Amino acid sequence: MKASLADARLYLCVDSRRRQGDLPAFLDAVLGAGVDVVQLREKGLEAKEELRLLDVFAEACRRHGALLAVNDRADIAYAARSDVLHLGQDDLPVGIARSIVGDDVVIGLSTHSVEQVQAAVSDPAVDYFCVGPCWPTPTKPGRPAAGLDVVRYAAQAAGDRPWFAIGGINLQNLDEVLEAGARRVVVVRAIADAPDPAEAAAEFAARLAAAA
């Protein structure tokens, strides 16, 4: 699984698409277009409802050979048998999360500063990390942007550790992120809110592949 994560370039965070009512079709479209990792990110879900939705995500991931990620909760990741658990700075320590999910689950960590990147790189328990937000984003209201300088630092410091740039990334500013040294990105609205999500995902995937 860690090898699959290392090969991943395009990581999508998306909600349950309750408003659109198209979750299975949406997942098939974007995973078929080149999304490598997909994470359900929707605050306030009861555990039972989150697991029900994750079943839909898992089925789509199996069809397309993609990785399923769970946000924040090691217990949900364990119950859903996800491939990936992503933790924030204020979530469970990585070592405790590992004791819950086991050795086969890939664990990632959010970082927002040079110091946090340094800590992630020096911790062998962190399988990958995310760097950002590159720009202010409504997904994380009130969080100041880390900016591209932290992305540039990660590009120099990460070595062989996989990492993703995140936060406000879209097709218009993707080249700036690539020029800063990122070769993997996490995307939210630029795919989920696109007029044609599959077309947007395909363009992200193609441009990331060209930069690899």
Curated annotation (Swiss-Prot):
Give the co-factor note: Binds 1 Mg(2+) ion per subunit.
Recall the GO molecular function terms of this protein's record: magnesium ion binding; thiamine-phosphate diphosphorylase activity
Instruction: Give EC number(s), comma-separated.
Output: 2.5.1.3
Cited Pfam families: TMP-TENI
Pathway(s) it belongs to? Cofactor biosynthesis; thiamine diphosphate biosynthesis; thiamine phosphate from 4-amino-2-methyl-5-diphosphomethylpyrimidine and 4-methyl-5-(2-phosphoethyl)-thiazole: step 1/1
Q: Name one GO cellular component term.
A: cytoplasm
Q: Does the keyword Manganese apply?
A: no
Q: Any idea which positions bind 4-amino-2-methyl-5-(diphosphooxymethyl)pyrimidine?
A: Q39, L40, R41, E42, K43, N71, S110, K140
Q: What class of enzyme is it?
A: transferase
- The record lists Mg(2+) as bound by D72, D91
Please give the start and end residues of each transmembrane region. Answer: none
Q: Which Gene3D superfamilies match?
A: Aldolase class I
Residues that bind 2-[(2R,5Z)-2-carboxy-4-methylthiazol-5(2H)-ylidene]ethyl phosphate: T137, P138, T139, G168
Mind listing the GO biological process terms from this record?
thiamine biosynthetic process; thiamine diphosphate biosynthetic process
Q: Which UniProt keywords apply?
A: Magnesium, Metal-binding, Thiamine biosynthesis, Transferase
Catalyzed reactions? 2-[(2R,5Z)-2-carboxy-4-methylthiazol-5(2H)-ylidene]ethyl phosphate + 4-amino-2-methyl-5-(diphosphooxymethyl)pyrimidine + 2 H(+) = thiamine phosphate + CO2 + diphosphate; 2-(2-carboxy-4-methylthiazol-5-yl)ethyl phosphate + 4-amino-2-methyl-5-(diphosphooxymethyl)pyrimidine + 2 H(+) = thiamine phosphate + CO2 + diphosphate; 4-methyl-5-(2-phosphooxyethyl)-thiazole + 4-amino-2-methyl-5-(diphosphooxymethyl)pyrimidine + H(+) = thiamine phosphate + diphosphate
Q: What cofactor does this chain's UniProt record say it requires?
A: Mg(2+)
Identify the domain of life: Bacteria
Fetch the InterPro entries from UniProt. Aldolase_TIM, ThiamineP_synth_sf, ThiamineP_synth_TenI, TMP_synthase
Sum up the protein's function in the record's words: Condenses 4-methyl-5-(beta-hydroxyethyl)thiazole monophosphate (THZ-P) and 2-methyl-4-amino-5-hydroxymethyl pyrimidine pyrophosphate (HMP-PP) to form thiamine monophosphate (TMP).
**Database matches in NCBIfam families:** thiE
Family listed: Belongs to the thiamine-phosphate synthase family.
Q: What is this protein called?
A: Thiamine-phosphate synthase
Task: Write the gene name.
Answer: thiE
